[in-house]
């Protein structure tokens, strides 16, 4: 008996900004490399492609026997409890033999605290380096403009 092929579907809201949507596509690629799952697909609830339907179809076409949907959201809310499950339910109608589940979003996962700490440390180091180079007091906007790109 072979192990089932598990696909991961990372779902965000979707944006009119291509750069925002590209972040999820990059996250899917990186998670695939990190996790070892062979099928990791990005999907957007609205405003961008691929839709949840399109990504679900792709997972099945690539050989998925089951699909785990991860909401790429920080906090639980209506998108997690209602919208995403409904959109996945609709997508699954084409593939009634494929079981699926929706995980909780990031929430208060301990790994997030490490990420927050890393971002803060990086910003402080950059800020301190800029101050040393300027050899002056920080301008009023230094904190606001420091490290505005991910």
What are these regions (language model features)?
Residues 1-150:
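Active-site-proximal alpha-helix that buttresses catalytic centers in soluble enzyme cores
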